[in-house]
Amino acid sequence: MEADSPAGPGAPEPLAEGAAAEFSSLLRRIKGKLFTWNILKTIALGQMLSLCICGTAITSQYLAERYKVNTPMLQSFINYCLLFLIYTVMLAFRSGSDNLLVILKRKWWKYILLGLADVEANYVIVRAYQYTTLTSVQLLDCFGIPVLMALSWFILHARYRVIHFIAVAVCLLGVGTMVGADILAGREDNSGSDVLIGDILVLLGASLYAISNVCEEYIVKKLSRQEFLGMVGLFGTIISGIQLLIVEYKDIASIHWDWKIALLFVAFALCMFCLYSFMPLVIKVTSATSVNLGILTADLYSLFVGLFLFGYKFSGLYILSFTVIMVGFILYCSTPTRTAEPAESSVPPVTSIGIDNLGLKLEENLQETHSAVL
């Protein structure tokens, strides 16, 4: 009888156990990296914003389909009025450099441009639906994400890693899956009256949203949330009010008001007000780019609600799309970006705090630096 080899017949067992241990260790590392408290908090905050957007979309569609009310500028005007009554008035009662009059004296023209970008971004996207298709709006609206990343690179000095570009690509793949599901479900019935004009409006709106979001991130992290909301409320009310009188006065006059229509307007205004109030808080602890990736799921929430309210057809691709978008969002949040200081800057360096997921810490350190200088 031949003797067994020194390793014996059980030789593969240690190898198998070692491979299993390595795989288990890899899973633990992945879990520890992707499912931290900061990432879970970011996901929850992003989906809260998505639900606010879903609320605005559902109420607008209900007004349009059930009551033939198409007044996007009036709806935005009500939101800006709420921002004015809360945050602009708050600035008026502040003292020192945070006072409303002091801010207007130093930066009035900048906030006029910001208010114009914000108002028109909301308006042109809604108007685009009259000219182009749902597919075009959903796909071209994603154009704002690379524009936002480019603006963040040059204005906020954000520096991205390869994983961030992969994550964005994954999110856009999820949007493509959602669009495919819409086509298969028969939601692509309207071919639009002038597709080219509609597509241009979508690209313009996406770019204006990107500009507004970058300005919002800068103001929220460098100045204050109240200043951003107060100034947007002030100039947004003025600009949207003027535009309202020019483009929608006939539509408003033709509305047959009742308590149901009024309730839908109130619901829209509350959802939009919550969106504007909470988005700066989320951007403060993350970034404008990560927020825009997180709210890509808003259309899916609207679709799920539409299954019951508007009789949409369900497709398993919607679930797949939601999963893909969330995977991309988690990937993006798993690795922090960094902030590169400009070559010449009079501001004390804060490169060690230049991380998206540490927005709150950034403000604390800036305040400490300011106190030390004083």
Swiss-Prot record:
GO terms, molecular function: transmembrane transporter activity
Cellular component GO terms held in the UniProt record: membrane
Residues with the N-acetylmethionine modification: M1
Record bears the keyword Hydrolase: no
Pfam family, one: SLC35F
Domain of life according to the entry: Eukaryota
Keyword terms, alphabetized: Acetylation, Membrane, Phosphoprotein, Transmembrane, Transmembrane helix, Transport
Phosphoserine PTM positions: S5, S25, S371
Transmembrane residue ranges: 39-59, 73-93, 108-126, 136-156, 165-185, 195-215, 227-247, 263-283, 291-311, 314-334
Compartments in which it is found: Membrane
Membrane topology category: Multi-pass membrane protein
Family of the protein in this entry: Belongs to the SLC35F solute transporter family.
Main function: Putative solute transporter.
Protein name: Solute carrier family 35 member F2
Organism lineage string: Eukaryota, Metazoa, Chordata, Craniata, Vertebrata
Gene: SLC35F2
